[in-house]
Regions:
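RNA pseudouridine synthases
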Residues: 1-273
Length: 273
């Protein structure tokens, strides 16, 4: 990946790169394995930039060790820096001991090979295996670092059917805790702060269609919070009495583009209502 700036003030290369949100580790990688050019000539991070200088950096190639697997991808948005994919339910985001190959990360590795992109897989927001919907994927480590710093400003909206009748909209602010070696999370004061807003969309005889906005991104957050108020997701066997097939879907994302600074809002056309 290449980036270029036109310099306005006197400043050291290292300090300038830090001011652009590039981490010390990334600067070290650029210094050791990439390139730093000032007006087309190689320089070091200690070089003192002058007004009207042109600074160009080249990030070192990233070494992706994952096995490429040809799994169809539904790409909703793509540019030179990132893409947004619509992950189907049942597909793990990353390889695990139980699912070492058939994951979104393996599918992205295959896709990167097809477009000749030398990069590892950088997932900005991660969805559980059984959750479907929109995920942001940074194409480069630098883009991932920038987006993770602004993770709290990424708007994440979900939708699902929950058990029972919910009459009013609401907000759940309850800490979520994970016992060591246990998959299930619980509401516990020892846990991390978590906040979920929810809006009732449609009420049926035995369930309610609800939309959610997350202020935090804890694992199983919506499932834990809704179960805590007596309305687990329909089909959720971990937090309810279902058979393990629920329809939690990430249907909308909003974020500020890390390079262009434009506001990007992506909404899926499909509704599960």
């Amino acid at each position: 990946m290449k980036r270029q700036w036109y310099i306005l003030d006197v400043i050291g290369v290292g300090d300038f790169l830090l001011s652009q949100g590039i981490s010390q580790k990334a600067i070290k990688d650029i210094k050791m394995k990439g390139k730093i050019l000032i007006n087309g000539k190689h320089q070091t991070v200690r070089y003192l930039l002058q007004p009207d200088d042109v600074l160009t950096i080249f990030y070192p190639p990233e070494n992706n060790q994952l096995t490429p697997v040809d799994i169809p991808l539904k790409i909703i948005y793509e540019d030179d820096y990132l893409l947004v994919v619509d992950k189907p339910a049942g597909l793990p985001s990353i390889p695990t001991r139980r699912h070492p190959l058939n994951t979104l990360a393996n599918a992205l590795t295959y896709y990167y090979q097809q477009i000749h992109l030398s990069s590892t897989i950088h997932l900005v927001n991660r969805l559980d295996k059984d959750t479907s919907g929109l995920m942001i994927v940074a194409k480069y480590r630098y883009i991932h670092d920038r987006m993770m710093k602004d993770l709290g400003h990424i708007d994440r909206y979900y939708q699902a059917h929950v058990q029972g009748f919910i009459e009013n909209n609401g907000t759940i602010r309850l800490p979520i805790y994970k016992e060591p070696y246990m998959m299930k999370r619980v509401i516990d004061s020892r846990g991390q702060a978590a906040c979920t807003h929810y809006w009732v969309q449609n009420v049926r005889r035995d369930c309610t269609f609800v939309r959610f906005k997350l202020e935090t991104g804890r694992t199983h957050q919506i499932r834990v919070h809704m179960a805590s108020i007596g309305h687990p997701l329909v089909g959720d066997s971990l937090y309810g009495d279902g058979l393990g097939h629920f329809d939690l879907d990430s249907y909308r994302l909003g974020f500020i583009h890390p390079i262009t600074k434009q506001i990007i809002t992506i909404t899926k056309n499909r509704s599960i209502e």
